[in-house]
């Protein structure tokens, strides 16, 4: 079957591209998923997230189900439990609760998700095998042999690399280049330490972002809205008016850390006229969000209030109570309306809040629960803000942040804009629009929110990515991930510690199985096509699909969990297809964090293209282009949106590791030549994305960075 593609360097007659899939396997595309025999099919108001490779195809597969799926986006559906037997070959069941449906539920729903109950398995199921059988005949793309020349990278100093860029610009933006959690803190800290960089600012988003920083004494601080520069003497830190803030949470969780550590923030932390995240915004988030889709920080609801001009800003709290009451009363209509539609009482809301906190992680604060219980909710909030904010002597100073940043630039000082989340989590990016945050967290969004004159002041973007173990947390498509984004939540795994400690605990063995068996022809250039085989990994706890094993092992071994939610992040390969667009929009500079992880890998992988394949033969129209089975999407082609990306499978280029020549700061001699594997990886990323790599992270400490000569 001829391959159809969209733009790029190659056409349908290029060697290794035409007839990308074996016609004997794909003619007519007969493969289609079927629910397990005897189970009730899920009925939803929209297509389920089509992660086909994890669908249980037959009754034999279904017999091994024991997961505890959570709620699917905005719907609850009935599910028949086939069996709660442990995963195949296991000695004992995993410590996740089996799903139980309430057949007598008057609403016709249950607490279980039929899609995930029938779709996800720990082991390799028949559906995964069928997908692989269709793709295994894909002809190797010529790009798998690129780049032909491996660059040599030499180490240089901070002063001769990063600081030259800082000194040539007025506004420096540090931005996430993937889906957040890229390790931006090191680069922020390095830029902030420059003598001319006097102002560090957060200019949008809210406490759904999170970063961990350490002071010189080694004390740990976890900040969400507070800029990282608070720990550096002589720096002024700002939270701009386009940010959204829960001032009670900000005082209780962030400012209290500074107070307890004896850090004087009075002349170093300033807050603009931010939009206020109220308790009802957080409850709206809880009541209206799908499992694993939100940090429960009220982001979407408060941005809704902001756009509708119905909410309150910080200045309202510091002025007359009557105006505050009227605005709160009007804005709260949305909350009361949702309770009415869902037929929920205050007691129901309190119960749901306590259920959310039942595992010991406080996702819904006490004062939010107290609000839900309050009879006069408006008066409750007026008093809450009067006592905890307006009359709180510890509340930081307020100012016109835009004016102060502009004044600093006119004095010749540098301004650092600390980007929350990332490019692909930005609400302004249509590709992942349904699973993004609610602010524009691209570099363009940062600059717009700062309200600094981009024609007057010279700006630069420092993009940050992470490899190996590029990760995403939350729902949505991510073709390069080892498992679907909702895989962990479907097992009722809310935090990293919910993962059974003995499961896939031998990271060394798991990664070896992936690269040895998952890519059986990796050493044969004529046969390696970059498609991962659905092989299995076994340990004393059971047998697991290699993608599942790598997802669990990576999350545990690398400590990959959300800084805010503690949810396990889903790891995968560095994605050149996605980063090419990031580089086009806000490149070319890139720093790669955590590259010393590669010291423990036999090989490292980078996704250089996707192949579109839907066993049902489903076609997806994106921006007027219809994606069909066999389409190849290369780095440099337009990135399709999520409806198509759910059907995309990664084509992975493998690069030999550097175990014998580790780069970790604790093991490497400064200025020692970088291993060939590192140079090959960096060369591949630069080749496929056109970026310019400034530095690589090689350890946990703030100064564990190798700067590269340009």
Curated annotation (Swiss-Prot):
Record-linked Gene3D superfamilies: Adenylosuccinate Synthetase, subunit A, domain 1, Adenylosuccinate Synthetase, subunit A, domain 2, Adenylosuccinate Synthetase, subunit A, domain 3
Q: Which GO terms describe its biological process?
A: 'de novo' AMP biosynthetic process; IMP metabolic process
Q: Which domain of life is it from?
A: Eukaryota
Ranges where the record places region Disordered: 1-54
Q: Which GO MF terms are attached to this record?
A: adenylosuccinate synthase activity; GTP binding; magnesium ion binding
Specify which residues bind Mg(2+) according to the UniProt entry for this protein.
Answer: 181, 210
Binding locations of substrate: 563-569
Might you give the EC number(s) for this enzyme? 6.3.4.4
Residues bound to IMP are 181-184, 208-211, 295, 309, 421, 437, 567
Q: Which cofactor does it need?
A: Mg(2+)
InterPro entries, per database record: Adenylosuccin_syn_GTP-bd, Adenylosuccinate_synth_dom1, Adenylosuccinate_synth_dom2, Adenylosuccinate_synth_dom3, Adenylosuccinate_synthetase, P-loop_NTPase
Residues binding GTP, per UniProt: 180-186, 210-212, 569, 697-699
Output the Pfam families linked to this UniProt entry.
Adenylsucc_synt
Cofactor binding notes: Binds 1 Mg(2+) ion per subunit.
Q: Which residues form the active site?
A: 181, 211
SUPFAM superfamilies in the cross-refs: P-loop containing nucleoside triphosphate hydrolases
Task: List UniProt keywords, sorted A-Z.
Answer: Cytoplasm, GTP-binding, Ligase, Magnesium, Metal-binding, Nucleotide-binding, Purine biosynthesis
**Cellular-component GO terms for this entry:** ciliary plasm; cytoplasm
Composition-biased stretches (Basic and acidic residues):
44-54
Instruction: Quote the biased-composition stretches of kind Polar residues, using this chain's numbering.
Output: 10-25
The subunit field of the Swiss-Prot or TrEMBL record says:
Homodimer.
Q: What does this protein do?
A: Plays an important role in the salvage pathway for purine nucleotide biosynthesis. Catalyzes the first committed step in the biosynthesis of AMP from IMP.
The record's section on PANTHER family has: ADENYLOSUCCINATE SYNTHETASE
Q: What is this protein called?
A: Adenylosuccinate synthetase
Q: Which organism is it from?
A: Leishmania major
């Amino acid at each position: 079957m001829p391959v159809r593609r969209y733009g790029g360097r190659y056409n349908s007659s290029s060697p290794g591209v035409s007839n990308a899939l074996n016609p004997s396997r794909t003619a007519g595309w007969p493969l289609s998923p079927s629910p397990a025999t005897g189970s009730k099919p899920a009925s939803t108001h929209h297509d389920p997230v089509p992660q086909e490779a994890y669908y249980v195809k037959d009754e034999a597969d279904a017999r091994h189900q024991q997961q505890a799926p959570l709620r699917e986006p905005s719907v609850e559906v009935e599910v028949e439990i086939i069996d709660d037997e442990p995963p195949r070959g296991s000695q004992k069941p995993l410590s996740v609760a089996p799903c139980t449906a309430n057949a007598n539920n008057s609403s016709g729903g249950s607490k279980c998700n039929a899609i995930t109950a029938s779709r996800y398995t720990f082991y390799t199921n028949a559906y995964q095998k069928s997908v692989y059988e269709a793709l295994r005949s894909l002809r190797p793309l010529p790009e798998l042999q690129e780049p032909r020349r491996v660059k040599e990278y030499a180490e240089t100093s901070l002063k001769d690399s990063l600081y030259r860029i800082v000194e040539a610009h007025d506004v420096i933006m540090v931005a996430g280049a993937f889906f957040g959690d890229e390790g931006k803190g090191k680069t922020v800290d390095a830029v902030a330490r420059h003598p001319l960089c006097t102002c560090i600012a957060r200019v949008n988003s809210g406490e759904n972002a999170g970063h961990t920083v350490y002071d010189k004494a080694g004390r740990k601080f976890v900040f969400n809205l507070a800029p990282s520069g608070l720990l550096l003497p002589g720096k002024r830190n700002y939270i701009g008016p386009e940010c959204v803030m829960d001032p009670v949470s900000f005082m209780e969780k962030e400012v209290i850390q500074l107070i307890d550590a004896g850090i004087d923030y009075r002349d170093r932390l300033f807050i603009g006229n931010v939009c206020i995240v109220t308790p009802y915004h957080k409850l709206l988030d809880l009541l209206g969000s799908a499992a694993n889709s939100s940090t429960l920080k009220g982001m979407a609801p408060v941005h809704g209030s902001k756009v509708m001009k119905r909410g309150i800003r910080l200045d309202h709290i510091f002025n007359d109570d009557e105006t505050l009451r009227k605005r709160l009363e009007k804005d709260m209509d949305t909350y009361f309306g949702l309770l009415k539609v869902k037929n929920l009482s205050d007691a129901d809301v309190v119960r749901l809040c306590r259920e959310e906190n039942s595992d010991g992680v406080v996702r819904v604060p006490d004062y939010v629960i107290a609000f839900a219980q309050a009879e006069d909710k408006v008066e409750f909030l007026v008093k809450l803000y009067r006592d905890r904010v307006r009359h709180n002597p510890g509340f930081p100073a307020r100012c016109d942040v835009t004016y102060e940043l502009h004044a600093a630039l006119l004095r010749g000082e540098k301004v650092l804009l600390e980007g929350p989340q990332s490019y692909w989590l930005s609400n302004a990016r249509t590709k992942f629009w349904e699973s993004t945050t609610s602010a524009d967290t691209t570099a363009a969004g940062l600059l717009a929110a700062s309200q600094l004159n981009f024609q007057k002041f010279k700006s630069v973007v420092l993009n940050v990515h992470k490899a190996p173990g590029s990760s995403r947390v939350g729902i949505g498509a991510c073709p390069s991930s080892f498992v679907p984004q909702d895989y962990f939540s479907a097992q009722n795994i809310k935090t990293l510690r919910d993962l059974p400690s003995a499961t896939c605990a031998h990271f060394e063995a798991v990664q070896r199985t992936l690269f040895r068996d998952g890519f059986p022809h990796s050493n044969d250039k004529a046969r390696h096509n970059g498609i991962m085989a659905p092989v299995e990994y076994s340990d004393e706890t059971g047998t697991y699909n290699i993608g599942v094993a790598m997802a669990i092992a990576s999350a545990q071994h690398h400590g990959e969990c959300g800084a805010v939610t503690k949810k396990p992040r889903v790891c995968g390969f560095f994605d050149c297809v996605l980063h090419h667009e990031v580089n086009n929009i806000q490149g070319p500079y890139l720093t790669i964090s955590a590259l010393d992880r590669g010291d423990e890998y036999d090989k490292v992988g980078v996704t250089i293209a996707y192949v579109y394949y839907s066993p049902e033969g489903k076609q997806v129209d994106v921006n007027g282009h219809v994606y069909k089975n066999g389409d190849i999407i290369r780095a440099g082609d337009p990135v399709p949106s999520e409806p198509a990306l759910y059907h995309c499978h990664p084509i992975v280029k493998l690069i030999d590791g550097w175990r014998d020549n580790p780069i970790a700061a604790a093991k490497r001699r400064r200025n020692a030549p970088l291993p060939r594997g590192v140079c090959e990886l960096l060369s591949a990323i630069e080749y496929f994305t056109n970026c310019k790599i400034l530095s690589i992270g090689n350890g946990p400490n703030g100064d564990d960075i190798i700067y590269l000569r340009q």
